[in-house]
Amino acid sequence: MSLVDLGKRLLEAARKGQDDEVRTLMANGAPFTTDWLGTSPLHLAAQYGHYSTAEVLLRAGVSRDARTKVDRTPLHMAAADGHVHIVELLVRSGADVNAKDMLQMTALHWATEHHHRDVVELLIKYGADVYAFSKFDKSAFDIAMEKNNTEILVMLQEAMQNQVNTNHERANPVANPVTVTAPFIFTSGEVINLASFVSSANTKATSAHLEEMEEGNSLDSSTQQVVGSGGQRVITIVTDGVPLGNIQTSLPAGGIGQPFIVTMQDGQQVLTVPAGQVAEETIIEDEEEEEEKLPLVKRPRMAEMTNRVEEMKEGSERELLQQQLQEANRRAQEYRHQLLKKEQEAEQYRLRLEAMAQQQTNGVEVDVTVVEEVAEVDAVVVTEGDEVERATQVMKSGRTTEPHTNVSIETISS
């Protein structure tokens, strides 16, 4: 059996998890080949969850960080399919936990994408970078937010608090950020209205009491609250330009029984407040959001100015089109005059040619010479009737014909 066939059989055995077949093929010299996508036997074993097969291949020396044509490693495969035991095997064998594929996604990204909580927990345990950003400028936390997976959100938030951020800038940083550094704290409760935080000094909650809070200024716009499910209290703050510096509290003596996730509608980040800790929230706003907060008086003026600019642009475009049309008409007239002039010149030249041909026909005689070829004959016998006829023809034509000197003519009378 050729090496190519041995390599193909090794790939198939790894795909099916046939440990004995894998050992036999490697003992017979089967090479560690890949298929047309660059998938190695270890990739297939990790993808299909064959723990013992992956262990055999790793002991045989297969590369633990082998790359496919899209730069995916066996760890990417195992994490995406939720094979936590193979993920642990690969990481313990020295696989790069932060390896990125062609989309700049790590194994943590893929595990979060497919809701594999155990894999996410294991990767964080082995030091996966929770601040890594993909090609689409998303971290694992952003993906968990999109998937609305609160368990993974809390897990990643705790890891972000315990891990130093070495990736300080995203791929596309937000221009002109606005930072609010005033600290604010929330405690547990079934339904929490933020307006009550600043309207009075004493606030009561349904499931846990709140300590006294300093009275702040009243909010300029309405606030909303949302209570999450699954054992987590989720508070959504709709700021609409509310100065968050007015909200100031202190932790109660009992602390917070469970983590909170506070999402800012006008911001980008999500805050989780664990028990016994004080956290600050940084809000980043875009320039478009700043424009939305302009006074209502300025908005019509800006709309009028925008309309005027658009009308001016349309008018200039129309003038340009009219100028181009006039120029095209002028050129067409020039071409038409030139064509008429050429036609007149051609007609004059034709008339001259006809006149010249007529003159040549009237003033020149055409001489036509008829050459008679007479075959060489020794003697010609002419009867009297022929001679009379010949004489008659000569009289009619008015011409005389000399007899040939070399031909003897004899007249025979009958």
UniProtKB/Swiss-Prot annotation:
Coiled-coil regions listed: 310-362
Pfam family of the protein (one): Ank_2
Cellular component per GO, a single term: nucleus
GO biological process: positive regulation of transcription by RNA polymerase II
Subcellular location: Nucleus
Record InterPro entries: Ankyrin-SOCS_Box, Ankyrin_rpt, Ankyrin_rpt-contain_sf
Example of a GO MF term: identical protein binding
Phosphoserine modified-residue sites: S218
ANK repeats: 5-34, 37-66, 70-99, 103-132, 136-166
Tissue expression from the record: High levels in thymus, spleen, kidney and intestine.
Highest taxon of the lineage: Eukaryota
Record's keyword terms, sorted: ANK repeat, Coiled coil, Nucleus, Phosphoprotein, Repeat, Transcription, Transcription regulation
PANTHER family for the chain: ANKYRIN REPEAT PROTEIN (PTHR24193), GA-BINDING PROTEIN SUBUNIT BETA-2 (PTHR24193:SF86)
Subunit structure: Heterotetramer of two alpha and two beta subunits. The C-terminal is necessary for the formation of a heterotetrameric GABP-alpha-2/beta-2 complex, and also facilitates homotypic dimerization. Interacts with ADGRB2.
Function: Transcription factor capable of interacting with purine rich repeats (GA repeats). Must associate with GABP-alpha to bind DNA.
Descriptive protein name: GA-binding protein subunit beta-2
